[in-house]
């Protein structure tokens, strides 16, 4: 049995109506230790790559942290990429961690 679990997270971006790519939801995988709600979680995202199964997620969850491998609405649709909208999408992931997952501290993980 694994010491971590993965939950699918999918939410609409707040700026979806203002962008031609906006109909795609933000989505990702939230990794947590089994039987424990983390107080600290990390979020990692890439403008076009799929981070929902990020290689660091299981190791960090086993050590007691939450990890949200987050995909903006531009995953696989780089041609429509707008930085301002991607930042809003990242903010949606941070809000989900604080409001839905109950995390106290969110760490933005740079990875590129």
Each model region followed by its residue ranges:
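N-terminal cap/lid segment of alpha/beta-hydrolase-fold proteins
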Residues: 1-40
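Active-site glycine-rich loops that stabilize anionic/oxyanionic intermediates
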Residues: 35, 39, 45-51
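Short loop/turn motifs at secondary-structure junctions
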Residues: 38, 64, 102-104
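Structural motif
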Residues: 40-41, 107
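Conserved HGGG/HGGXW glycine-rich cap/lid loop of the alpha/beta-hydrolase fold
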Residues: 41, 51-53, 58-62
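Conserved alpha/beta-hydrolase
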Residues: 60-77
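Catalytic nucleophile-loop/oxyanion-hole region of alpha/beta-hydrolase
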Residues: 73-107
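Gly/Ala-rich beta-loop-alpha elbow adjacent to hydrolase catalytic centers
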Residues: 108-112
């Amino acid at each position: 049995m694994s010491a971590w679990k993965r939950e699918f997270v999918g939410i609409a971006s707040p700026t979806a109506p203002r962008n031609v790519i906006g109909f795609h939801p933000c989505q990702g995988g939230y990794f947590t230790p089994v039987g424990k709600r983390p107080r600290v979680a990390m979020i990692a995202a890439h403008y076009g790559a799929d981070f929902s199964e990020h290689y660091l997620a299981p190791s960090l969850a086993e050590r007691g942290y939450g990890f949200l491998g987050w995909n903006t609405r531009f995953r696989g649709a780089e041609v429509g990429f707008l930085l301002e909208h991607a930042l809003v999408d990242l903010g949606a992931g941070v809000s989900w961690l604080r409001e839905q997952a109950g995390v106290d501290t969110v760490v933005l993980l740079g990875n590129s």
